[in-house]
Each structure stands twice: as C-alpha cells, then as structure tokens.
C-alpha cells in the first residue's frame, strides 16, 4: 500500500510537471510570434557556412505606434518647380547610412528602414544574399539599340522608412492573420512615408560591358538568381544596379503620392557608385486628358513629351542615357514597360488583385486600343485610397503590400514556407541541406 502511494505521488508530480511545462510553452508560443521568413531561395546552408556568406535579414521590428519623427527636409522643396533638387534630396535621405553597408538596415546607424514581409514565397521569391525578388523580363533593345541579350531580367529589393514600417506592422500585426482592411481603415500610409526600391539587371558582365555602355563602371551584387528569366533554376550570379524608384506620401500631391525614378550612368564616375543613379524624372499624376498613342520601346534618344502636365523628365542628355520612358512619355524606368507608367501600375494596387496592373497584362484587357476609354481606366488620377475595383481593398499604391497578402493566401493553401528556417545559424548542425532549388555544394 505504501509503495502504491509513493508511485501515485510520483506520478502526480510528473503529471504536474508536464502540465506546467505545457502551459508555459503554450503561453510562450501565444505571446511571441514566429518571425517572418527572411528569404525563400538560397545556396545550401553548408555553402553559407563554408564561404562565410552574410545572409539577408528581413527588417521586421516594425514600430508599434506612429513615429513622431518630423517630415524630411525635402518636404520644404517645391517638387514641381525644383524637381531635380527634390529628387537629389530624396536620394540622399534614402542613401544615408545605407550605401556603405550594402543596404542592410540592421547596420544602418542613421535611420531605420523596413522590408515588406511575405516577399520570400513562390518561384519569384526573395533570394538570400540581398533579399532580391524576381520582377520582370527585359526585352531585346529595351535598354538601348545595342542590347541584343534576350533573357535578362529585373531583380529588386524595397525599403520603407519608419512611418511606412508602422503601417506594415499594423496590417501584419498577427503574423498568421494579416488584416488588409487596416489599410483602408487607417487611410493608407501616413504622410511622410518614404519607400524606395533598387533594381538590378541579371546579365553576364562581359555582355553588359559590350551591349550597355552606360552600365560600364557598374555596381555589382551577388545574388541567387539566374541569367535566363524564364527559368525557375537559380545559381550564384552577379547582377548590376540599373534603376531606383521612390514613392513619397506627400499631401501636396493631388493623389497623395509623388513618384520618382533614377537611372544608372557609370560615366558620372562618383566615388560612391550608388550616386551614379541620376534623376530620370518625377510624376504626381497620370495626365488622363492625354490620350495620344506613342511609345519609344527601343530608345536611341529620350523622347520628352511637352504636353504632359504631371510628369517632368530630365532634359540633360549628358547626364541621362537614352531612355524609353512610359506610354506617351510618362515616367517609367528602364526596367519598366514602355506602354505603362509608374503612376498607372501603382494606382491599380489592390487586394485581391481583381484587375491587372496594366491593360497589357491580361487576355481580357490586352486588346484594348491604346487611348480608348477602356485603356484610359489605367491612366486616371485616382485618390490613393480609392478602390480600383469594387470588392477589393486599396493598398494605397503599394504593389508589394498587395502581393504580400496574396502570397500569404497562396501559402495558406499549401503550407509551404519554412525553407528559410534551415539558415538559422544556430540550427545549422540540427538540419540537413533542405534547399528545394539548385544547390551549389
């Protein structure tokens, strides 16, 4: 009897310990969310260790309350009359503390920058060197008459300042249950939000040197990407900086956003090569009254349309290499579509994406006649928080927010998104190489 009592007491103690441990573990799980994945494509962990590769780290410690930082100094500049001064000041704001650390926010000692989560997922998802995502193919002649290489592509990474990061954090407050409606409820991003994106070209170095003169003296990054945009396979390649986009939430603009673009020109020969990105132009509307159908898909020179009232293009031909721009001379960068515009694509951002971001990108709309009423739906001056489609939530000109939410929905169906965890340095010894893509061992 005594022995049974001792065994019973022992069993109760063990059971109590198990229940206590389970309760503590459960509370820890509920109080602390798993971080968002950093990336979705990379060489194997063994190669990362062997070569001491610095991995991309998603900046995701989003502000919990709206930052009280003052508006940047460039808000004092007239963005129409002094457009170039404005763009140079924006560029400096984006570059401070970033250019000397390869744009790794965790190393920036000047100001905080954040990334959009859920860009890691899918075939086009983030790679692990710099967080670049696969964006768009580059057609023959798109970068100039001498460009004959046909399989290159655009790879990009974007950054948001503290006010932009605050909005991202509100939408993604629950990592497993993002709330798109908060975008609309909050009126989108607050004034003072600054977003910028660096775009790189995937093309072999010797080809770039021969075919794209303004990319000589280029700035190159390592990336887990490829030189054939149509291929899903990846390998370690060199990609070259070619473009920078900026978006500034500024209520002086009719829509609420000012959009700018920069193009790389190695002949500028700045000691900090990032500053070889020269202002291409600025826009604050889409000139909806202008329906003339012209484009310049293979640029021998930059066509500047004097009739546009809401786009300004850099007229300095010594500074700006020939550029195709957008439809009828609207602002668009070298890696963008010559039949669209910066404003056009971003104004269609919504979740779910019921309409394509360009009438060219869907069989139902690709036959619209340029300049027709159907076509011009994509070239209106929409308020940044208005709905492009009924039944969708506007994401305030943020294509990345719309894409991130859609990626999360797609993942919920497949539950396939834990690949990045094998790159947790502390866990290397516990995991085998689990890369789902081509590996370099």
Give the label of every model feature segment.
Residues 1-13:
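N-terminal Sec-pathway targeting helices
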Residues 13-31:
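Bacterial Sec-dependent signal peptides at the C-terminal "C-region" and cleavage site
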Residues 4, 17, 396:
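Functionally constrained cores in energy, signaling, and assembly domains
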Residues 28-341, 349-353, 357-441:
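Conserved small-residue
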């Amino acid at each position: 009897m005594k022995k049974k009592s001792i065994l019973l007491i022992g069993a109760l103690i063990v059971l109590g310990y198990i229940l206590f441990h389970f309760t503590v573990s459960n509370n820890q799980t509920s109080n602390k969310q798993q971080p968002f994945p950093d990336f979705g494509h990379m060489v194997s962990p063994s190669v990362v260790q062997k070569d001491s590769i610095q991995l991309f780290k998603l900046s995701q410690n989003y502000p919990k309350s709206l930052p009280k930082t003052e508006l940047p100094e460039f808000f004092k500049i007239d963005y129409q009359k002094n457009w170039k001064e404005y763009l140079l000041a924006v560029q400096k704001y984006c570059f401070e503390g970033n250019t000397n650390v390869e744009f790794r926010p965790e190393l920036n000692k000047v100001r905080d920058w954040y990334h959009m989560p859920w860009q890691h997922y899918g075939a086009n998802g983030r790679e692990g060197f710099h967080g670049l995502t696969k964006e768009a193919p580059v057609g023959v002649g798109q970068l100039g008459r001498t460009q004959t290489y046909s399989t290159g592509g655009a790879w990009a990474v974007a950054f948001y300042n503290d006010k932009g990061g605050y909005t991202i954090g509100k939408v993604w407050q629950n990592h497993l249950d993002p709330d798109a409606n908060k975008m609309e409820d909050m009126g989108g991003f607050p004034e003072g939000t600054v977003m910028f994106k660096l775009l790189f070209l995937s093309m072999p170095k010797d080809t770039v040197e021969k075919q794209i003169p303004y990319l000589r003296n280029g700035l190159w990054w390592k990336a887990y990407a490829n030189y054939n945009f149509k291929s899903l396979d990846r390998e370690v390649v060199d990609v070259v900086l070619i473009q920078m986009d900026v978006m500034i939430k500024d209520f002086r603009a009719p829509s609420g956003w000012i959009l700018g673009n920069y193009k790389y020109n190695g002949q500028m020969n700045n000691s900090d090569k990032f500053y070889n990105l020269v202002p291409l132009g600025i826009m604050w509307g889409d000139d909806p009254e202008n329906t003339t159908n012209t484009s310049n898909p293979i640029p021998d020179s930059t066509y500047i349309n004097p009739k546009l009232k809401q786009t300004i293009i850099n007229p300095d031909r010594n500074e700006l290499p020939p550029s195709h721009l957008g439809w009828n001379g609207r602002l668009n960068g070298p890696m963008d579509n010559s039949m669209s515009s910066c404003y056009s694509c971003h104004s269609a951002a919504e979740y779910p994406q019921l309409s394509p971001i360009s009438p060219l990108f869907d069989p139902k709309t690709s036959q619209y006649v340029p300049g027709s009423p159907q076509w011009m739906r994509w070239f209106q001056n929409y308020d940044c928080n208005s709905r492009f489609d009924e039944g969708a939530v506007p994401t305030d000109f943020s294509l990345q927010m719309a894409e991130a939410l859609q990626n999360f929905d797609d993942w919920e169906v497949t539950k396939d998104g834990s690949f990045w965890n094998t790159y947790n340095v502390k866990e290397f010894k516990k995991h085998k190489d689990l890369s789902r893509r081509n590996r370099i061992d």
